[in-house]
C-alpha cells in the first residue's frame, strides 16, 4: 500500500482542522493507506522533507480537531510554488517516501499547486493521486458556475459559512452603534473581503432578513473595479 500526505496552507482555522479530521478518518477507514503523514508548515514541510507520521494518532485525539482553533494539526504557510525546481523537489520527496496520495487544504493557490504537482507526477510516471480540500472565505473554489447559480464541484466552500455568520454579527452590532450615534456618524461604511466574486458582500444580507435595516450592498463593479 502507498502512503499519504496531508498539508494545509493559508489562514489557520478550526474549519481547516475539521476538514483535515475528516480526511484522516476516511483515509484510515479506507484500508488503502500504509502510513499517514502531515507536512510540517504546509508545502514548505514537503520541500524540506519534514513529514510528521500521524498514523498512530488515536481516534479520540483526531476527533478533538473538530473544535481545535488555529493550526492545531501540523502548521500552515503562505508559500507559493514558484519554480519548476520546487515542483520537482515535491515529486522527488513523494517518490522517496512512497507517497501515493497527496491532500492539500486551502484556497485558490493551494488548488493550483495540487494540480501542478498532479500534472508533473503524471509526466514523470509517478503513481500519485492529488486532491484539493477547499477552504476559502471567498466561496470561489467550486468549479464552473451552473445555470441554476450553483457551482459544479463545491457550492459552499468550508470557511464561507462561518465568515458570513461573523459578518452578520458585525453588521448587527454596527447598526446598534449607529442608532446610538447617528448624529455624528449618520452613515457607516463596512468594507469586506471577497476578491472578484462578491459572495461575502451578498451574504451580508443575512444580517437583515426582514429588510428593515437601511443596508446597501455595493459590489466592486459599481465602481468599475475588477481587482477588489
What feature does the model see in each segment?
Residues 39, 93, 101-106, 112-131, ...:
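Accessory alpha-helical/coil subdomains and C-terminal extensions
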Residues 36, 68-76, 212-218:
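Short beta-strand elements in bilobed, periplasmic/extracellular small-molecule ligand-binding domains
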Residues 1-50:
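N-terminal phosphate-binding or glycine-rich loops at protein starts, especially the Walker A/P-loop
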Residues 3-13, 72-77, 100-106, 187-192:
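Short glycine-rich or small-residue beta-strand-to-loop segments that form or flank ligand, phosphate
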Residues 13-23, 46-47, 83-87, 108-116, ...:
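Short glycine/serine/threonine-rich phosphate/pyrophosphate-binding segments
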Residues 1-7, 92-95, 179:
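Short, hydrophobic/aliphatic alpha-helical segments
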Residues 48-100, 109-111, 147-151, 156-173:
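Glycine-rich oxoanion-binding loops at beta->alpha junctions
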Residues 9-11, 39-44, 78-79, 107-108, ...:
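Short, ordered loop/turn segments at secondary-structure junctions
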Amino acid at each position: 500500500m502507498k502512503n499519504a500526505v496531508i498539508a494545509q496552507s493559508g489562514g489557520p482555522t478550526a474549519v481547516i482542522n475539521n476538514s483535515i479530521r475528516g480526511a484522516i478518518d476516511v483515509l484510515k477507514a479506507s484500508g488503502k493507506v500504509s502510513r499517514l503523514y502531515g507536512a510540517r508548515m504546509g508545502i514548505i514541510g514537503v520541500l524540506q522533507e519534514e513529514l510528521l507520521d500521524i498514523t498512530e494518532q488515536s481516534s479520540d485525539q483526531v476527533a478533538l480537531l473538530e473544535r481545535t482553533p488555529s493550526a492545531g494539526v501540523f502548521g500552515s504557510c503562505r508559500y507559493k510554488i514558484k519554480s519548476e525546481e520546487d515542483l520537482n523537489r515535491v515529486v522527488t520527496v513523494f517518490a522517496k517516501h512512497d507517497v501515493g496520495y497527496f491532500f492539500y487544504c486551502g484556497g485558490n493557490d493551494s488548488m493550483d499547486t495540487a494540480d501542478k504537482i498532479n500534472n508533473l507526477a503524471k509526466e514523470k510516471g509517478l503513481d500519485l493521486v492529488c486532491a484539493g480540500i477547499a477552504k476559502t472565505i471567498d466561496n470561489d473554489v467550486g468549479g464552473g458556475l451552473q445555470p441554476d447559480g450553483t457551482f459544479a464541484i463545491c457550492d459552499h466552500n468550508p470557511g464561507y459559512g462561518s465568515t458570513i455568520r461573523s459578518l452578520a454579527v458585525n453588521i448587527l452590532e454596527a447598526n446598534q452603534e449607529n442608532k446610538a450615534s447617528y448624529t455624528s456618524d449618520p452613515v457607516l461604511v463596512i468594507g469586506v473581503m471577497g476578491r472578484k466574486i462578491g459572495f461575502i458582500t451578498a451574504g451580508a444580507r443575512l444580517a437583515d432578513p426582514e429588510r428593515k435595516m437601511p443596508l446597501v450592498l455595493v459590489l466592486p463593479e459599481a465602481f468599475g473595479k475588477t481587482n477588489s
